[in-house]
Amino acid sequence: MRFLRENSLSIFFGVLLVGSLIGQSFAGLHQFNADALTHHESTYTWFRYVTSSEFGGDVMENWQSEFLQFSLYILSTVWLLQRGSSESESPEDLGLMSDKSQLVGRYAKRNSPPWAKASGPRRFLYENSLILAMTFCFFGSWLCQSVNGWRAYNHQQLEHKESTITWGEYWGNADFWDRSLQNWQSEFLAIGSMAVFTIYLRQRGSPESKPVGAAHDATGISN
């Protein structure tokens, strides 16, 4: 019970993720087969659909945009300021901050991670490990999107008796960039709105919000 309580946030979103993927697989299969019947093409079973490039491409489109959002957000909040937002550092804390405030090197505590106590490349990798992980996930999922999107695009071309293209050509194809950019703009809108909304709006008890009674121009504070 203690484990569930201490990890309830990650478990909650993990369950939502699995549930959403299952729901998407059935809804997507229904739509795919409906389109196939309209064009007098063969339909898919559920298993064939979830292992297809059509389903994989749709999933990766969403994943890569989420990882891009957080990669840019993590990096931009190091150097950029939004006055009054709980999502921004205070003006005096912008930048990489001091070793003392970051508890690294000789300022590390007894229970600090070992690499925070180290120096050189190990510390550099660890103090940038979050942005490195998010960036790796973004490029990995974007690469997977391109492969699945390319295969799905060529499958559609063959169904319509039209010429196929190479994977390299697909990177310059409007289909690839339409799929990418329509996801990116929604992520930029959401994260930008969050930064501005937290200036004036509150959610009692949430670490994503300032305390209810905090001034609108108070920057870099949260519950």
Predicted regions and their residues:
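Alpha-helical transmembrane segments and their helix-start/interface "positive-inside/aromatic belt" motifs
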Residues: 1-18, 120-136
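Interfacial/capping segments of alpha-helical transmembrane domains
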Residues: 26-43, 149-162
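Short, motif-level signal for alpha-helix interfacial/capping segments enriched in acidic residues
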Residues: 39-49, 95-96, 160-173, 214-217
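Alpha-helical transmembrane segments of multi-pass membrane proteins
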Residues: 17-32, 141-145
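Domain-level detector of nuclease and nuclease-like folds
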Residues: 105-140, 147, 152-153
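A structural feature that tracks compact, well-ordered secondary-structure segments
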Residues: 48-81, 86, 138-154, 162, ...
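Extramembrane terminal tails and long inter-domain/linker segments of multi-pass membrane proteins
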Residues: 1, 44, 85-121, 205-223
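N-terminal first transmembrane alpha-helix
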Residues: 5-12, 16, 22, 36, ...
